[in-house]
């Protein structure tokens, strides 16, 4: 049994998962410590509030409210579970976007801009084609594919700059992020898609339901009544599986990873490295565009376009998801669900206590920093393994070798030295 456990522990994947779990535990511990310190030092909070805050951080997804006595109650909260799945959808897709680029040795910090490009294209298509002429399901499909295409084209820009001009993709992505933000603002400003029917929604775009277009619930609303969940989470999971197969079961995936390991060695082996860079960033952009597309095709959320001075957090949270998942497509699913769970816990923390929901941002920040150091943890584990590895025994001398090596006692000194 011990030998089996030892063999499992020696696997690189096991140590990667262990490093991520350790990052999560330390992040939760730090968040709990912050809650405790604030609760014990604040004049408006108490130690009881601190204990309730810690409970909500760990069990916020299962919180059902407070009873008549004011105590927290826990159980299956269908609305919280469904909303967690809804919020996890863009996180999974932006996490995949970052992970695919990482596999090719690229840092896609431009997921936010690609997310905006996909959102813009999706909303224009979904709200411009009249559902009285074209079936709503077909409009949805065209809008979703259009969002992916817009994200792919926007992601291809830093890919082309990297492949053809060797411009650092981080710099190119940062620039394209803000170009996308201002371009989207201008396009919506001159459009007729602004919500003018509701005076309280100035600066917002109509929901896609205004044109009768929305993502199908696929029966999930019956499992999680009272929530915003829809079939987008299933689409995100399917795309994650497709990316996993692409990277691990195809020649193209091998070429992408070969370029990520060593671009010049891959070129020497006959792989078209420039094409891999452009296609990798295009795929990453398509996934980020799909994230924005599914989020707003849900019909649950209005897009705020006016004076866009902040990039969507989903693009940057995708970096945290990819780091936590160690860039594994299947791991991205679980990492996205975990990050979404923290988001729900933060909302419960705000609704049921006097704490601020941004405490969960502290937890996420700690987890991201530790996840970035997970490689050091793995290297440390590898070092310990090498130290514990027994040295191979010296080879036994061949029969008769000892006799051949012994000098002849009757020989002269010069002959003995020659024999030695």
Regions inferred by a protein language model and the residue ranges of each:
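Single transmembrane alpha-helix segments in multi-pass membrane proteins
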Residues: 35-40, 59-129, 144-148, 152-167, ...
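Short, non-helical or kinked segments that cap or interrupt transmembrane helices
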Residues: 41-45, 49, 102-121, 163-172, ...
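Hydrophobic core segments of alpha-helical transmembrane domains in multi-pass membrane transport
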Residues: 19-36, 91-98, 119, 123-125, ...
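Transmembrane helix-bundle core of multi-pass membrane transporters
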Residues: 177-249, 417
């Amino acid at each position: 049994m011990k030998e089996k456990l030892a063999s499992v522990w020696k696997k690189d994947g096991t140590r990667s998962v262990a490093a991520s779990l350790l990052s999560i535990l330390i992040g939760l511990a730090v968040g709990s410590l912050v809650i405790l310190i604030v609760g014990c030092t604040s004049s408006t909070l108490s130690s009881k509030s601190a204990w309730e805050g810690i409970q909500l951080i760990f069990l916020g997804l299962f919180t059902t409210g407070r009873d008549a006595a004011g105590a927290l109650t826990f159980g299956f909260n269908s609305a919280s579970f469904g909303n967690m799945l809804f919020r996890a959808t863009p996180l999974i897709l932006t996490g995949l976007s970052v992970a695919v680029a990482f596999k090719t040795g690229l840092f896609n910090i431009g997921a936010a801009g690609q997310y905006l490009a996909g959102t813009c294209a999706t909303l224009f298509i979904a709200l411009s084609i009249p559902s009285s002429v074209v079936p709503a399901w077909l409009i949805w499909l065209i809008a979703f594919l259009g969002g992916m295409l817009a994200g792919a084209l926007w992601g291809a820009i830093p890919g082309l700059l990297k492949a053809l001009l060797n411009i650092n993709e981080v710099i190119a992505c940062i620039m394209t992020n803000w170009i996308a933000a201002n371009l989207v603002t201008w396009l919506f400003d001159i459009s007729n898609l602004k919500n003018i029917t509701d005076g309280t929604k100035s600066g917002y775009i109509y929901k896609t339901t205004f044109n009768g277009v929305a993502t199908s619930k696929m029966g999930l609303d019956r499992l999680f009544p009272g929530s915003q969940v829809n079939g987008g989470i299933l689409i995100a999971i399917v795309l994650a599986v497709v990316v996993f197969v692409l990277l691990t079961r195809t020649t193209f995936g091998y070429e992408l990873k070969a370029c990520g390991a060593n671009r010049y060695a891959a070129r020497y082996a006959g792989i078209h490295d420039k094409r891999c860079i452009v296609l990798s960033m295009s795929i990453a952009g398509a996934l980020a565009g799909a994230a924005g597309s599914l989020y707003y095709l849900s019909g649950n959320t209005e897009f705020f376009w006016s004076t866009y001075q902040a990039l969507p957090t989903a693009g940057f949270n995708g970096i945290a998801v990819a780091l936590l998942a160690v860039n594994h497509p299947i791991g991205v699913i679980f990492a996205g669900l975990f990050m979404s769970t923290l988001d729900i816990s933060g909302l419960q923390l705000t609704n049921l206590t006097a704490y601020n929901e941004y405490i969960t941002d502290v937890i996420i920040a700690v987890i991201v920093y530790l996840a970035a150091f997970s490689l050091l943890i793995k290297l440390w584990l590898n070092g310990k393994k090498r130290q514990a590895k027994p040295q191979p025994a010296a080879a036994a001398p061949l029969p008769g070798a000892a006799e051949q090596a012994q000098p002849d006692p009757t020989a002269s000194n010069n002959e003995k030295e020659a024999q030695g």
